[in-house]
Design a protein with these regions (language model features):
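Acetyl-CoA-dependent GNAT
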Residues: 16, 44-101, 112-113, 118, ...
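Conserved catalytic-core motifs of GNAT/GCN5-like acyltransferases
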Residues: 78, 130-132, 142, 146-167
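A short, internal acetyl-CoA/4′-phosphopantetheine-binding micro-motif in the GNAT/acyltransferase core
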Residues: 95-104, 131-135
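Conserved acetyl-CoA-binding loop-helix of GNAT-fold acetyltransferases
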Residues: 104-121, 140-143, 147
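Conserved GNAT acetyl-CoA-binding A-motif
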Residues: 119-133
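A short beta-loop-alpha structural element at the N-terminal edge
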Residues: 13-25
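C-terminal "cap" of GNAT-fold acetyltransferases
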Residues: 92, 158-186
Length: 186
């Protein structure tokens, strides 16, 4: 059950992101950069850079979704290229960020489910989650992905340094659509 609904809150709608969402998206991301390890950036980018990134995701044919309730953006999720080489063209990497007040309410699961559906509909076959060090919000991210059927495929140890400590990085993977049961449409 969606915890937000159990608390008497209306279920947020999941919809494609729009340029008007960029200020809220930038604020959510800035908080993640400054206070967490989901992003390994050290300084939050400004709205102009977030707009550029948003446009690049859409121009690449990838989905960019937001969770909205009563006009407030509670979180966002998008997929992008896992790696730039052509053989990776059917594999995407996901990113999900939630406003601090939206964490732990089931909204991440709504975003992830919608993102997986949107990626499968576009013909992507594998989704990779690159998850920070396994503490704080990263614990929630791992649980979120496990509940969605992702499996841990590896841990790179002590590969990042942020907030005065070394960070591990987890890789999780989930098959989408046809997975590897047939060759991709070329």
């Amino acid at each position: 059950m969606l915890i937000a609904h159990a608390l008497g809150m209306t279920t947020p709608s999941i919809r494609p992101g729009h340029p008007a969402d960029i200020p809220a998206i930038a604020a959510i991301y800035a908080h993640a950069v400054l206070h967490g390890t989901a992003s390994w950036e050290l300084e939050p980018p400004g709205e102009a850079e977030m707009q550029r990134r948003f446009e690049a995701i859409l121009a690449g044919g990838y989905p960019y979704l937001v969770a909205e309730r009563d006009g407030d953006i509670l979180g966002y999720a998008y997929a992008g290229a896992y790696r730039p080489r052509p053989a990776y063209r059917t594999t995407v990497e996901n990113s999900i960020y939630l406003a601090p007040t939206a964490q732990g309410l089931g909204i991440g699961g709504l975003l992830l489910d919608a993102l997986m559906q949107a990626c499968a509909a576009r013909g992507f076959r594998q989704m990779i989650a690159v998850i920070g060090d396994g503490t704080g919000a990263s614990v929630g991210s791992r649980r979120l992905h496990e509940r969605a059927g992702f499996r841990l495929i590896g841990v790179a140890e002590k590969v990042g340094f942020k907030h005065g400590r070394w960070l591990d990085q987890m890789l999780m993977q989930k098959e989408l659509g046809e997975g590897d049961r047939s060759p991709p449409g070329l």
